[in-house]
């Protein structure tokens, strides 16, 4: 179906076509109606056309008015919009999306990523500076406190100083004994574990019976054997300590 046939029969197409023709020939955009720059050139063109030629008949007058309208709507391709009394803007830059500037989506993502990176770095640097400043303040405070303590000379007698040093020495000796016992305990446990692994590897069955079974807790062991220092080869009798309790085998 041709467009002419459709235009002759369809009311909706007729309405759309009439509205389009009306918009192209008559309708002037609102921003051009309010623009004094457009009005100035519009009036100047009208005066020039009236001064240059005078229509002799009604047909010539209609043709002249039609040509004037066509000239006024198509001559100014760069529409200048007045922002204020001084600044003006070319509407061609924003006519595709009024109120917004057309941008590239990828460029927006790049700009947003750059902005996020810059803000992250700025915040990171600020946190680092604040932390260093706080540490510096604490060091200054501690140094000032130490200087105050050094300036204060406590009035203690020689006997009191000797008592304090004696208590410090006793505490250090007690701590040393505890650490020595703990070290000895872990050494024995390590030797115990190593010897047990060796004996299990040597006397494992592996499909046959061992001719000499393992005698855990045996007393008759040569003195030159390392097993003498191990707990499971010692006599099972446990000693009683000074408090009346059984002593740990370790």
Swiss-Prot record:
Disordered: annotated span: 29-70
Name of the coding gene: IES3
Oligomer status and interactors: Component of the chromatin-remodeling INO80 complex, at least composed of ARP4, ARP5, ARP8, RVB1, RVB2, TAF14, NHP10, IES1, IES3, IES4, IES6, ACT1, IES2, IES5 and INO80.
Note: Present with 2300 molecules/cell in log phase SD medium.
Function per UniProt: Probably involved in transcription regulation via its interaction with the INO80 complex, a chromatin-remodeling complex.
Example of a GO biological process term: subtelomeric heterochromatin formation
Keyword Cytoplasm: no
UniProt superkingdom: Eukaryota
Keywords: Nucleus, Phosphoprotein, Transcription, Transcription regulation
Biased composition (Low complexity): 52-70
GO cellular component: chromosome, telomeric region; Ino80 complex; nucleus
TM ranges: none
Protein name per its UniProtKB record: Ino eighty subunit 3
Residues bearing the modification Phosphoserine: 157, 211
Location of this chain's protein in the cell: Nucleus
């Amino acid at each position: 179906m041709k467009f002419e046939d459709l235009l002759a029969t369809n009311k909706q197409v007729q309405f759309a076509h009439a509205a389009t023709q009306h918009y192209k020939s008559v309708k002037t955009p609102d921003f051009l109606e309010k623009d004094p720059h457009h009005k100035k050139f519009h009036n100047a063109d009208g005066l020039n056309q009236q001064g240059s030629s005078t229509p002799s008949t009604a047909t010539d007058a209609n043709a002249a008015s039609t040509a004037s309208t066509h000239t006024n709507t198509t001559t100014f391709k760069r529409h200048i919009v007045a922002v204020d009394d001084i600044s003006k803007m070319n509407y061609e830059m924003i006519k595709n999306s009024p109120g917004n500037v057309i941008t590239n989506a990828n460029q927006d993502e790049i700009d947003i990523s750059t902005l996020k990176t810059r803000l992250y770095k700025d915040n990171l640097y600020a946190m680092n500076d604040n932390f260093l400043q706080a540490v510096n303040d604490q060091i200054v405070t501690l140094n000032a406190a130490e200087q105050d303590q050094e300036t204060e000379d406590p009035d203690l007698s020689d006997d009191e100083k000797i008592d304090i040093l004696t208590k410090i020495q006793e505490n250090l000796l007690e701590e040393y004994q505890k650490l020595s016992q703990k070290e000895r305990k872990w050494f024995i446990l390590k030797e115990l574990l190593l010897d047990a692994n060796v004996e299990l590897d040597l006397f494992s069955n592996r499909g046959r019976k061992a001719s000499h079974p393992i005698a855990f807790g045996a007393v008759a062991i040569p003195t030159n054997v390392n097993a003498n220092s191990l707990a499971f080869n010692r006599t099972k009798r446990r000693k009683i300590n000074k408090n009346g309790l059984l002593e740990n085998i370790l």
